[in-house]
Amino acid sequence: MKKIIKLFQAILNIFIFLALYYILSFIGSLLFLLFCCFITKTPLRLLPPNFIDSNFFMIDGFACFLTLLVYLLIYKLKKYNKNRYINKLPRKDIPKYALISMGMGGLSALWLIFADKILSSITIVKNSLQNFSQISESLNNEAYIFIFLSVILFGPIVEELLFRGLIFNEIDKIKGGAAPIILSGLLFGLFHREPVQVVYASILGIILGFVYSKTRSVPLVIFMHMLNNLVATLPPPLAKHEILQFVNGFQIISVIPMVYLLYKLYKKGSLTS
């Protein structure tokens, strides 16, 4: 009976954590809009119809900042892994984890190539690729500083606190081993909603979950997530065709050492030589 109660409590907590994301995102976005109305002395109803779309990353960055404060508070109060708590960046091994992050980007690139070349005849994949392309193009419509804050800085912190810091540990309390790695990874994938993103985000989530299971370091998986997003959204001066081609090629090549490093982490529990 106690196991059933613990299971339902974990499921309820996970539901609350996920619901909080959408609630806080809405509140944060609304507060930002009201602030804009106050500064410009414009009634909310008179804001341009495309105001949210044209300022999406600026609004999302503010909402993410609010959300991460709440998640950080919950994470601290929960005191997960109290007796085996390792929450520091393993500085000597940072280059190796950075290489794993690059390999994660390589897997994403390979999946998108496969989806585009092989699966694009499937309607849902074709539509999803088009939507994904539109999302990518929207990155050109705002100042890079807001994209940086939303996609590279605050976004990864929020998502890692949510999926590795909170959800992973809730599942781990019920069932250890591969269960929290896989389930938190799949939820991370579904969280991204767009079908082509769901696939590679699930794979990335499972890899990040595996790294977290071995290191118990939230800052480490935040770093890996940030690096992955940074390489995917380079600043305009670096977003040249030749540079992007080189980066994509390096990411794909990095898949090989990534597999080796993950195997080493699996066998030894550390990447330290």
Place the predicted regions along the sequence by residue:
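Membrane-interface capping segments at transmembrane-helix boundaries
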Residues: 75-82, 262-273
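Juxtamembrane helix-loop-helix connectors linking adjacent transmembrane helices
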Residues: 42-53, 84-155, 173, 242
